[in-house]
Structures are given as C-alpha cells and as structure tokens.
C-alpha cells in the first residue's frame, strides 16, 4: 500500500514535468519584441505563466517595478534628450538613467522617441500628461519606463518636457548626441535663420528672450549682487593700496593661512602681519562707510547691462558673427523677423 502511494506521487510528479509548458522560440521572440526584456527573463515569465502572454507581460512589469523601487535613491545624470517638430507643435523629451552605456542603447533611444512621438501627437502640455499617454505598442508611458528600468537594472525617470505651440519652429539636437536639444520659434517662416538661432541657444544658454521678459525678481537679485560685488571691489582696492604704501605685499596677507605660511617661509615678519591686520580692519571700515553711492549704482548698472547682453537671446552676440547681435542678424535677413519663443534642455550640469 505504501509502495503504491509513493509510486503514484512519483508518477504525478513526472507527468507534471513532462506536461509542463516549455516556451518555444516563436513565443520567446514575440514576447521579447513586445517587452524588450532579456532572453532569460522572457523564458522565465513564459514558463511561470504557462504561455499566457498577458500574465507573462505582467510578471515582467512587476519585476521592473521592484527594480525601480530598489534604485529610487540613485542619481540619474545620463539619459536621452530628443526633439521633434510637426505642423503647429514641437516638443523636447528627456528620459534620464544612470549610465551612458544604457543611454546610448538603441532600445533606450527608441523608447525616448516613442514617448516623444506620443507627446507630439497628443500635443501634450505637461510632463504629467505625457506620463499618462500611450505609446505605439499600447503601453502607458510610465509603465514602459518602469519596464525598461527592470530590463536594464537602472533607475530611470522621465525628467524633462518642453513644448512650443504654433508654426515656424526650428529644432536642433546638438551634435546629434541626444544630450542637448533646443527649439526656436520665429514670427514668420525662416528655416535658415531659425536653425542658426537654435544653435545659438544651445551654445550660449540664454535665460530670457529679451530684457523685457526677464522677471523683476531676477533683475532685483542681479542688481543686489552687482552692488555688493562693486562695494567689495572698491574696499579691496583701498586695502591693497594702503598695504603697498606700508611696504607690505597684499598677496602675502590676503588670508590667515597665507599669513601663517608666509611667516614660516620668512617672507613676512610677525610685526608686519600685525600691522597688515590693523590696516585691513581700519581701511575696510573707513572705505565701506564712505563709498560714493552714485558711483556704486553706475557700476552696478553697467554690470546689469552686461547680464542682459549675455543672458537675453536677442541681446547676445551672434556666434557666427560677433559684430552682430542676434536681433541684428535677424533684421539683416528680414527687417520684421524676430524670435518669439525658445526652449532648451540639457543633461549637463550648468
């Protein structure tokens, strides 16, 4: 009786092994095409689901979620940035990951392109809206990103999205490296000039279109910094002049560390250090209390104008001809031609 029982168990076990689903090459190929998952993951998912493609896809998706959760604190400093324009709409999408090896992979670039295509087709107005879109294979964008994270084992995040609505938009992928993209919209059709300005935006990093579009809070902060810097420079000049008059090299006493180091080298005496400290304290206080306000404001205004020239697109020197501003370059092509909007996204820390 006992022998019969064990024989039955063994036979049942063997029959399950014999009858167990074994994924064939066609199923493996189809699921890999659908998910982009690795060979081992596809085989395992098909086996566990006994050939049920929907269950297998869910297994792969859950694995991606688990990996993404484990790596949520990782830094994503690499990725893929792509840009696209169609009639009436243009957008930039940035999908970030941990390493350039993954970022440069064909599957990763394709996923970024699929997301961009969906965003442009839907004329999406926000990153949250993009995440809820469906890409060409029927997968929701956020699910596709999580799945790719599971496949590569890296944290991934859809981190950047910009758009311009309207016509006359030229786009630029800097050096075709998919790390910096720009869009420029002109007030009338001007493909050559638009492309040139898109390159300008990539190289010169403007923060505003023109002086009028700079927020007042930014202007106020620039003035504050310019005034403070000007005051510090005026005080420093007075201190250096007083030190030189006393026969002390300002470079030898510009910090406590230098004072100690230079005394050890015999370049300056303890008495000179004491004298220098007294000069620095006295002259700094006197000069700071008697700075001419009109002069300070004039110098600060000059620095603000320099900020506008460097940071406002239309005020910038044109990179292809430094004798012209961007506005002048556009007017040379057409007296009414100008830029009405621009966007820029880069993976680089700037």
Regions found by a protein language model. Give the residues of each.
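Short, Lys/Arg-enriched N-terminal segments with co-localized hydrophobic residues
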Residues: 1-18
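N-terminal assembly/interaction segments in proteins that build large macromolecular machines
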Residues: 20-350
């Amino acid at each position: 009786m006992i022998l019969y029982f064990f024989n039955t168990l063994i036979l049942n076990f063997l029959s399950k092994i014999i009858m167990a689903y074994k994924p064939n090459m066609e199923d493996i190929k189809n699921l890999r095409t659908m998910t982009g998952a690795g060979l081992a993951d596809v085989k395992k998912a098909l086996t566990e689901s006994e050939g049920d493609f929907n269950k297998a896809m869910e297994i792969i998706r859950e694995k991606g979620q688990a990996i993404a959760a484990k790596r949520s604190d990782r830094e994503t400093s690499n990725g893929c940035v792509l840009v696209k324009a169609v009639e009436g709409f243009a957008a930039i999408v940035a999908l970030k990951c941990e390493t350039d090896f993954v970022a440069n992979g064909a599957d990763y670039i394709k996923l970024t392109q699929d997301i961009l295509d969906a965003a442009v087709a839907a004329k999406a107005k926000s990153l949250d809206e993009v995440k809820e879109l469906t890409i060409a294979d029927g997968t929701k964008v956020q699910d596709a990103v999580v799945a790719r994270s599971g496949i590569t084992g890296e944290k991934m995040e859809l981190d950047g999205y910009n758009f311009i609505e309207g016509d006359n938009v030229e786009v630029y992928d800097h050096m075709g490296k998919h790390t910096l993209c720009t869009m420029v919209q002109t007030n009338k059709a001007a493909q050559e000039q638009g492309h040139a300005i898109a390159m300008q935006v990539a190289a010169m990093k403007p923060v505003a279109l023109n002086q009028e579009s700079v927020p007042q809070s930014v202007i106020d902060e620039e003035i504050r910094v310019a005034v403070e810097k000007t005051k510090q420079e005026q005080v420093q000049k007075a201190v250096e002049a007083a030190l030189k008059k006393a026969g002390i090299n300002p470079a030898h006493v510009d910090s406590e560390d230098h004072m100690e180091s230079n005394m050890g080298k015999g370049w300056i005496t303890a008495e000179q250090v004491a004298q220098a400290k007294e000069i620095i304290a006295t002259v700094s206080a006197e000069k700071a209390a008697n700075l001419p306000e009109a002069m300070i404001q004039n110098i600060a205004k000059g620095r603000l104008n320099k900020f506008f020239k460097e940071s406002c697109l239309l005020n910038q020197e044109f990179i292809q001809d430094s004798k012209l501003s961007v506005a002048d370059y556009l007017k040379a092509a057409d007296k009414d031609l100008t830029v009405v909007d621009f966007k820029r996204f880069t993976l680089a820390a700037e």
